From Swiss-Prot:
The lineage of its organism: Viruses, Duplodnaviria, Heunggongvirae, Uroviricota, Caudoviricetes. The distal half-fiber contains two molecules each of Gp36 and Gp37 and one molecule of Gp35. InterPro entries: Tail_fibre_p36 (IPR005601). The keyword tRNA processing does not apply. Keywords: Host-virus interaction, Viral attachment to host cell, Viral tail fiber protein, Viral tail protein, Virion, Virus entry into host cell. This is Tail fiber protein p36.
Amino acid sequence: MADLKVGSTVGGSVIWHQGNFPLNSAGDDVLYKSFKIYSEYNKPQAADNDFVSKANGGTYTGPITINYGVNSYLQLSNNETPIRIRSGGGTGNTLVVGGSSGGISFRPAGSEITTGQITITPEGLTTFTRAVTAPSITVTSTPSAASDVTRKDYVDGAINTVTANANSRVLRSGDTMTGNLTAPNLFSQNPASQPSHVPRFDQIVIKDSVQDFGYY
């Protein structure tokens, strides 16, 4: 039997022993020189190693980079089409947000607060819950519904087109009519002073009335 002692070797290598390979147990842990040895039983924990845990979450203090490409994205799982955020465009300089059947909702006041929410449906319809302020809004379609936003050319065309129907215009600043004017009553703020003026009621003598003109 070989006599094992400090410095004994096997095949030229020093035999490990408590002195040169210190292993110690601490409960269910095994320590090497006071350092914990991880194993299949004792796996690394996020809190011990500054990891972000799949189960417990965590906080990144530095940037997270997702490389450009159709297969590189941040995905939010659901029971339908996955919701994804990725870079798009020819060089990855476009933000692409892919929604599902419920559309996309932007909530400026908080993820659980619908005040001020902006919703985009899968059909491309956008709904605002508050007023929209912009230097200009461009409408590419001719309005058809009563609630549609109209276009300047549509309004200008309706105003500037003078026809013989009810859309014919009379300028408030003064105008000349080529047809008869019929109204229940006409109110004149000033009395007639020229032969072409229409007289007011207080300037005429009522038919069949008795007038006392006095003595001449």
